[in-house]
Amino acid sequence: MNIIINGGTRGIGKEVVSFMAQDISNHILVTGRDEKALNSLSAKFTNVKTFALDISLFDSTREKFIETISDNLGRVDRLINLAGHLIVKDFLDFTNNEARLIMETNFFGTASLIRALVPMMPEGSHIVNISSMGGFQSSSKYKGLSYYSASKAALACLTECLANEFKEYGIIINCLALGAVQTEMLDEAFPGYKAPVNAVEMAEYISGFVLTGNKFFNGKILPVAIGNP
């Protein structure tokens, strides 16, 4: 199976790579901004290739990225969109550049990546967007997460729209709205907070869903949380 993991250099994404790479029949391409971390992954796993990518600037490297996918994979059976950016700040204190960076990373860049890869995805392939309970309708909302939550809500809604558009291609797309997970990003944003789930546990769940969830769901926004969030 040919798998692209968008945002796989740390946290949940890194653990998803580790889990998926255990099956040597999987051919994986991992994207991320941290080239040192990417090199470490490709050195550790023989079935992992990497591509240095800032998803917020995807359009500037689109042609090179598509060429890399064509050379290394040919087709894409699974796409996991994990790349994300979080700034914790009161809405009134945000600058336009900070707000745009969140939206470019969490929504526009991911949407551009999907648009570029769909022509390479066969019938029966599966796209999984990783959203957040912060963007899940009627979930608890938290101070300082206005733009982050809005970007994740946009990604969830896009998932529903694309499920309808991609029916003619036989491509399945779903969205997992994650609750709090103990990761570097959570530690940086909320020092001292202890989440009920760690990155390894969540990665195992996500990996299983990526492989088999397309048999049971399409266009669904599924909360993956013990509490709210």
Predicted regions and their residues:
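Conserved glycine-rich Rossmann-like NAD(P)H-binding loop of the short-chain dehydrogenase/reductase
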Residues: 24-40
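C-terminal helical subdomain
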Residues: 175, 191-229
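Catalytic loop of short-chain dehydrogenase/reductase
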Residues: 128-154, 159-160, 164-168
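N-terminal Rossmann NAD(P)H-binding glycine-rich loop of SDR-like oxidoreductase domains
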Residues: 9, 17
